[in-house]
């Protein structure tokens, strides 16, 4: 897998083409991704680059984290993320170095990963797009109920994986094949066509598209 960047979702807006067409876009803030560790096959069993970004109050950094960041010679960030890498990805990448928004270029296709918005406990109609039952005709309390879950006497049980009410959202989601509309290295901004997972202010991971 190729190296990506960790950024913060700023929100959505739109841009116009020269022909006047409106394109919905999401703006992602890319602060410098500081390299905290370079893993190799001999020591770790696989190749990867570990990065951090942003800042975190000193009181919120554990002693182990302080030592890890100090060893890399970088300021403590709001988390650590890891990207699997091959030999070509590791060229010129050293501990303490930075990866900036210019990792991507205009027109490139990317995959964006984030945590979807949490919706809490939801019923089958909202969570799984089930149809509602009759509003009248003798139905008094089961308008949004999911109905039978265990079939008949045979099998007489609820199969694993049955779609039922429960926690909705707040899951790791990846949207593939989004186009980079523009890259602003000076201000650390990526403008990506379409919507990406998560709420405004949430962390997102931007990688080169696996299907490009």
UniProtKB/Swiss-Prot annotation:
<feature type="compositionally biased region" description="Polar residues">
    <location>
        <begin position="140"/>
        <end position="155"/>
    </location>
</feature>
<dbReference type="InterPro" id="IPR019926">
    <property type="entry name" value="Ribosomal_uL3_CS"/>
</dbReference>
<dbReference type="GO" id="GO:0019843">
    <property type="term" value="F:rRNA binding"/>
</dbReference>
<comment type="similarity">
    <text>Belongs to the universal ribosomal protein uL3 family.</text>
</comment>
<keyword id="KW-0699">rRNA-binding</keyword>
<dbReference type="GO" id="GO:0003735">
    <property type="term" value="F:structural constituent of ribosome"/>
</dbReference>
<keyword id="KW-0488">Methylation</keyword>
<dbReference type="InterPro" id="IPR000597">
    <property type="entry name" value="Ribosomal_uL3"/>
</dbReference>
<dbReference type="InterPro" id="IPR009000">
    <property type="entry name" value="Transl_B-barrel_sf"/>
</dbReference>
<feature type="region of interest" description="Disordered">
    <location>
        <begin position="140"/>
        <end position="166"/>
    </location>
</feature>
<dbReference type="InterPro" id="IPR019927">
    <property type="entry name" value="Ribosomal_uL3_bac/org-type"/>
</dbReference>
<protein>
    <recommendedName>
        <fullName>Large ribosomal subunit protein uL3</fullName>
    </recommendedName>
</protein>
<dbReference type="Pfam" id="PF00297">
    <property type="entry name" value="Ribosomal_L3"/>
</dbReference>
<comment type="subunit">
    <text>Part of the 50S ribosomal subunit. Forms a cluster with proteins L14 and L19.</text>
</comment>
<feature type="modified residue" description="N5-methylglutamine">
    <location>
        <position position="153"/>
    </location>
</feature>
<dbReference type="GO" id="GO:0006412">
    <property type="term" value="P:translation"/>
</dbReference>
<comment type="function">
    <text>One of the primary rRNA binding proteins, it binds directly near the 3'-end of the 23S rRNA, where it nucleates assembly of the 50S subunit.</text>
</comment>
<keyword id="KW-0687">Ribonucleoprotein</keyword>
<keyword id="KW-0689">Ribosomal protein</keyword>
<keyword id="KW-0694">RNA-binding</keyword>
<dbReference type="GO" id="GO:0022625">
    <property type="term" value="C:cytosolic large ribosomal subunit"/>
</dbReference>
């Amino acid at each position: 897998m190729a190296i990506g960047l960790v950024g913060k979702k700023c929100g959505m807006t739109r841009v116009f083409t020269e022909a006047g067409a409106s394109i919905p876009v999401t703006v992602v803030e890319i602060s410098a991704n500081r390299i905290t560790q370079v893993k190799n096959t001999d020591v770790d069993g696989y190749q990867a680059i570990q990065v951090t970004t942003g800042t975190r109050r000193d009181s919120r950094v554990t002693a182990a984290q302080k030592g890890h960041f100090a060893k890399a010679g970088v300021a403590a960030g709001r988390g650590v993320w890891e990207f699997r890498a091959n030999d070509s990805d590791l060229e010129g990448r050293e501990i303490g170095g930075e990866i900036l928004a210019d990792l991507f270029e205009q027109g490139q296709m990317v995959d964006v990963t984030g945590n979807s918005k949490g919706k809490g406990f939801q019923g089958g109609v909202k969570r799984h797009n089930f149809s509602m039952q009759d509003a009248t005709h003798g139905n008094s309390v089961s308008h949004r109920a999911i109905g039978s879950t265990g079939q008949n006497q045979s099998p007489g049980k609820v199969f694993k994986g049955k779609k039922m009410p429960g926690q909705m959202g707040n899951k790791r989601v990846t949207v593939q094949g989004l186009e980079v509309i523009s890259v602003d290295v000076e201000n650390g901004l990526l403008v990506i066509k379409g919507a990406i997972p998560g709420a405004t202010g949430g962390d997102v991971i931007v990688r080169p598209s696996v299907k490009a």
